[in-house]
Amino acid sequence: MISVTHRRYVPYSHAHYAGHLVDGAYSLGLFGDVATEVCIRLDGDEGLFASYSDVQFKAPVRAGDVLEVTATVTRMGTRSRTIDFTSVVVCRGTDGSAASVLDEPSVAVTATGTVVVPPRR
């Protein structure tokens, strides 16, 4: 099956909580972006997100982090695709403008989602 990966810097403007924490919806939004590319590559259409299942928030995401978000198609129906998602922190912002590459990336969020695409013509 197909996998697509995006990397994204988390801007400080997205921090909503003490310790520069970013809400979990940020990663879910990135899952939508990477799912869109999956649909374009497979079907030539952006598709629509139908549902999420088994969303797990495993580690914090903070402003200044760099996330690697991957979508892997695990099932293809006639008009639906089941996709496994992971959001991994690969760099962590530190004080000021400093940041460091993590020796061991941290899995922050996992989920399974279903997208639907138009019927083939």
Model-derived features with residue positions:
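Hot-dog-fold acyl-thioester-processing enzymes
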Residues: 1-49, 108-110, 114-121
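Active-site acidic-Proline motif in GNAT/NAT acetyltransferases
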Residues: 59
